[in-house]
Design a protein with these regions (language model features):
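Local sequence-structure signature of Cys/Sec-based thiol-disulfide redox active-site neighborhoods
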Residues: 18-46
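Structural micro-motif
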Residues: 60-71
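Short, internal strand/loop/helix patches
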Residues: 43-60
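Hydrophobic h-region of N-terminal signal peptides that target proteins for export
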Residues: 9-18
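Non-catalytic, surface beta->alpha helical segment in thiol-disulfide oxidoreductase systems
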Residues: 73-106
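Short, acidic, Ser/Thr-enriched surface-loop or helix-capping motifs
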Residues: 15, 71-72
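Flexible, solvent-exposed short loops/turns enriched in glycine
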Residues: 49-50, 64, 84-88
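Positively charged n-region of N-terminal signal peptides that target proteins for export
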Residues: 1-4
Length: 106
């Protein structure tokens, strides 16, 4: 019985986790002063990674850092916010939060 409850708990936790929108911020170590503070964002799993830790194909596809990638529960990229020439993301927290809310309604 204990094992059955454990399995059910893991499956439910996995299902609940898979319903989340994921935000991945990728930046370079030399640009860490321009990391975007995502602590105010709700309704999404927030992750951070350095560019050097990404596979080469992803490293080569990123033209500017930092970049914020918003993915739906299926892992599909729904929106990207990319730094401008100042190496900073100009999007507001409200813009990012609104995008998360929009994706969660789909």
């Amino acid at each position: 019985m204990k094992k059955l409850l454990s399995v059910i708990f893991v499956l439910v936790a996995g299902f609940v986790y898979s319903q989340d929108v994921t935000i991945l911020q990728i930046n370079a170590e030399w640009n860490k002063k321009n990391n975007y503070d995502l602590s105010e964002i709700t309704g999404a799993v927030v992750k951070f990674s350095y560019l050097k830790d990404q596979p080469l194909d992803i490293q080569n596809s990123i033209m500017a850092v930092p970049v914020i990638v918003i993915m739906d529960k299926n892992g599909r990229i729904r929106r990207q916010f990319i730094a401008d020439i100042s190496l900073q993301i100009k999007a507001t927290h409200l813009e990012i939060q609104n995008e998360i809310n929009r994706i969660k309604k789909l």
